[in-house]
Amino acid sequence: MVDSEWRPSIGGRLRRYAQVTSTMSGLAARLAGERYLGIELDRGKHANQLREALGSLKGPLMKVAQILSTIPDALPKEYAEELAALQADAPSMGWLFVKRRMRSELGEGWEDKFDSFNKKACSAASLGQVHEASYNNEKVAIKLQYPDMDSAINADLNQLKLVFSLYERIDSAISTKDIHSELSDRLQEELDYQRESLNMKLYRFMLAGENEVVLPEPIEELSTSRILTMSWVEGQKLMKYLETEPSQKDRNKVAINMFRTWYVPFYYYGVIHGDPHLGNYSICENLKINLMDFGSIRVFRPDFVGGVIDLYRALRDGDNELAVHAYSQWGFDGLDKEAIEILNIWAGFIYGPLLEDRIRPIQELRDGNYGRELAGKVHEELKRIGGIKPPREFVLMDRAAVGLGSVFMHLKAEVNWHQLFHGMIDDFTLEALQTRQTNAIREVGLSESLLGV
């Protein structure tokens, strides 16, 4: 535990900037030396050092690193692999921080509001930590945001922009401007726990008809913009669950429940939970899914969802004109025939399990490196034709698909993904999704500015 990180001061912010600048500038300098001076860089060694440096930093940079590790070739392979290893359960902050945070948010005598309060965090992540407590004789979870995260976001994202800009000079395959903008907006939203409380209500509304998912309920009188109190959900994390050696039937059931938990909101309401990180869900004894952490969600335009479905149909039918239309709906601009053919290679990998009407694993080859190797080939082809600029929407959509694919591979699930998918899209219309999305946003009190984003 560490209390020394309670630094809501100018000095603390300067130390933060200095630490992040040192870490990211070191990466930038090494990449520049490799590209412009012919200096041979031991990427594996330096990537490991980078992970260790970022792992010691609480806050958004660690979250950004986890996201970047799932975007094909946003960073060199060696760095992506090391950043993927960043753990959500970083060391928690101690009782001094907890007392200060709770008092500043709930006032003097905050302890009297609870029947009991566990001083030790039960989990810690990049932006905050969670404590167990009892309220009105019910078990609750309380998420406390780490200090000075708003300043940390500005420091981290400014330094990330430096690395992105330099990497683009070295490698022109991917333009990262919109990726940076998307990460910035989503991270700002994650710091607003009142917004997350509304997101939680949104998911409770959208998944009310799904019997195989359990969602916490926010407790408004014990929540602010920096602490979020919610009902407790009980379950096992994925890796612990797999240690129990569940049957193939049970693993398949968990996979189906996960698929519906993620994609019913998307295909019915145009909303995605963009963070299928191992710490954000657990598995009940009855195989239901506990979904947690609602900071990283995105509301899409209905025609974007239509574009996702149209791209599936284009790949299925070999319809190039429909593919052009679909990529346009995604937000890709100025793609020529060759660029679309290259993107279709990656799309074919992502959509592959949905295109085959049979029971199969999510990836026929169990080797988890296959997707990255394929992405590498796509990357080289994109670089050859001058590169593309992925739209903002791509970031969380791709992260969800790749992250869920990893979950299904861990489960070794064998499911008819085609039928699961068609069960959600066969009656799809833009008008019906727009109506459901509007009603859901209004029902929970989220800003209507989200509509049509």
Predicted feature residues:
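ATP-dependent phospho-/nucleotidyl transfer catalytic cores
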Residues: 77, 84-91, 103, 150-158, ...
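Conserved beta3 strand of the Hanks-type protein kinase catalytic N-lobe
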Residues: 133-134, 276
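Short, amphipathic alpha-helical segments that act as regulatory/interfacial helices
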Residues: 25, 58-62, 161-164, 201-204, ...
